[in-house]
Regions:
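Acidic/His-rich, divalent-metal-binding segments that scaffold phosphate/diphosphate chemistry
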Residues: 2-131
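Histidine/acidic-rich helix-loop-helix segments that form or flank divalent-metal centers
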Residues: 103-109, 146-150, 154-203
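An active-site-proximal "capping" alpha-helix that borders the catalytic cofactor pocket
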Residues: 84-87, 138-152
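A short alpha/beta connector and helix-capping loop motif
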Residues: 131-137, 200-203
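Histidine-centered active-site/metal-ligand motif
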Residues: 80, 115, 141, 165-166
Length: 203
């Protein structure tokens, strides 16, 4: 993605990473130092490339501002990402405990944290109203996330998980981690849509 220097924030890289760690404490659950650093770096890069001054202001999607705000900062991209990370971890552990299906916890948490990271550059607007920008209109959701993951040397399985999480893709999940992230993403999103009286992804 060509970077417009006008969109680069005046804060330092470390300032942005510190803020990302504050907003997404689930990053600390990734035990592998290299993978944890890559997740932070990808979030920092898309933020730097965007017009958003504050990551916490980005709505989850265009429907989010109209959804009931029952708690502070409900239905932002950050709270959605945190919800998917937490739901994924607990779901995977339940399936492992009750059915014996193992999973890679680090890969699962990292995938959950990165599944919507490209929305930072796909959407433009304010915390009260967003729409797809140039990249979001021309490139399928998740493709830029996958590109950045390839650039940082993440596994084919993790890249697959990001591509397969969205109904925009014709690829269905082929790993347990990808399957769990897809369903927990739908669960959190449909919870918002049901509360807002809108059509569910499930339909």
């Amino acid at each position: 993605m060509a970077r417009n220097e006008a969109t680069v924030h005046s804060t330092t890289t470390q300032d942005r990473i510190d803020r990302i760690r504050e907003l997404l404490p689930e990053i600390a659950q990734i035990g592998d130092d290299n993978l944890r650093t890559i997740v932070e770096s990808i979030w920092e890069q898309v933020w730097r490339e965007s017009d958003w001054q504050e990551l916490g202001d980005i709505p989850k999607n265009p429907s989010a501002p109209a959804a009931p705000q029952r708690v502070e900062n409900a239905w932002t991209l950050i709270t959605h990402t945190r919800a998917v990370a937490q739901l994924s971890a607990t779901s995977a552990e339940t399936i492992k405990t009750l059915h014996g299906i193992d999973y890679d916890r680090d890969s699962l948490v990292a995938l959950a944290l990165l599944h919507d990271v490209s929305k930072v550059v796909e959407y433009v607007g304010t915390k009260d109203s967003i729409a797809k920008g140039h990249l979001g209109k021309l490139i399928q959701h998740g493709v830029y996330s996958a590109f950045l993951m390839w650039q940082h040397g993440l596994s084919t399985e993790m890249v697959h998980g990001v591509i397969a999480h969205t109904p925009s893709s014709r690829i269905l999940p082929q790993t347990h981690e990808a399957l769990i992230v897809r369903y927990t993403d739908f669960l959190d999103t449909d919870s918002m849509l049901m509360d807002a009286g809108e059509e569910l992804y499930l339909s």
